[in-house]
A protein has these predicted regions:
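Second-shell loop/turn segments in exported
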Residues: 2-5, 68-70, 115-116, 152-154
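Short helix-loop capping/hinge segments that flank enzyme active sites or metal/cofactor-binding pockets
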Residues: 6-78, 141-149
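Stable alpha-helical elements in mature extracytoplasmic
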Residues: 11, 78, 82, 163-167
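Structural helix-boundary/capping segments
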Residues: 17-21, 126, 131-169
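Short glycine-rich anion-binding loops that position phosphate/pyrophosphate groups of nucleotides
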Residues: 21, 98-101
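Short, surface-exposed loop/helix-turn segments at secondary-structure junctions
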Residues: 67, 102-127
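Short, high-confidence coil segments that cap the C-terminus of an alpha-helix
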Residues: 90-91
Length: 169
C-alpha cells in the first residue's frame, strides 16, 4: 500500500514540475489539465485513469500520509531489506524488474477497453524499493511474455554500478 501512496504523491509533484517547464507548444501544463484531457480524448479511454485521478487528489509531499509511507518504505527497503542481504555478502539481488504490461487489443476489436485492475493488486516492485534505499538497479532484457518484453533487475549495494555492468555484460 505504501508503494502506491508514494507513487501517486510523487507522480503529481514531478509531473507538474515537468509540464510547467515543458515547451510552450505543450497544451497540457498540469496534472489537472491532464485529467481533463484524458476524460475527453477517445484514445485515452482504453486505460483506467485511477492512478492519475488519485494522484491529482493528493495534497503534497508534506502530507503526513506521504511522509509516513515514505519513511516506512525506506526502512523496509534499506535497514530491513536489501541492507540485510548485502551484509551477508550478497553481491547482487537478481529479480524480475516488474510485472509485464497488459496487452491492448487493436481498436475496433472485442475487448479493446482494458478493465482497471483492482487497487493494490500489483505486486510490490523490487525496483522501487532499490531506488528508495539508494541502490543501483540495472535492468537487462529477460525475454517476452505474450510477445511483450520483460526485464531482469540486478540490484547492488551503493557504488556497485561497475560490478553490475560487468555482470550484465
Amino acid at each position: 500500500q505504501e508503494q502506491r501512496l508514494i507513487l501517486i504523491y510523487d507522480f503529481k509533484q514531478d509531473l507538474n514540475a515537468y509540464l510547467a517547464a515543458s515547451a510552450p507548444a505543450q497544451k497540457v501544463r498540469s496534472m489537472t489539465e491532464l485529467v481533463a484531457f484524458n476524460k475527453v480524448d477517445e484514445r485515452e479511454k482504453v486505460w483506467s485513469q485511477d492512478l492519475v485521478e488519485a494522484a491529482e487528489a493528493t495534497s503534497g509531499r508534506d502530507d503526513p500520509e506521504y511522509v509516513e509511507a515514505l519513511a516506512y518504505a525506506k526502512r523496509k527497503a534499506g535497514p530491513e531489506g536489501y541492507d540485510k542481504a548485502f551484509a551477508y555478502g550478497v553481491v547482487a539481488v537478481v529479480t524480475p524488474t516488474g510485472q509485464p504490461a497488459g496487452l491492448i487489443p487493436p481498436p475496433g476489436t472485442a475487448g479493446h477497453t482494458i478493465s482497471a485492475r483492482p487497487k493494490g493488486s500489483s505486486p510490490p516492485s523490487p525496483s522501487m524499493y532499490a531506488a528508495l534505499a539508494g541502490y543501483p538497479n540495472l535492468t537487462v532484457p529477460m525475454g517476452q511474455v505474450e510477445g511483450l518484453p520483460v526485464g531482469l533487475s540486478l540490484i547492488g549495494p551503493k557504488w556497485s554500478e561497475a560490478q553490475l555492468l560487468a555482470m550484465a555484460y
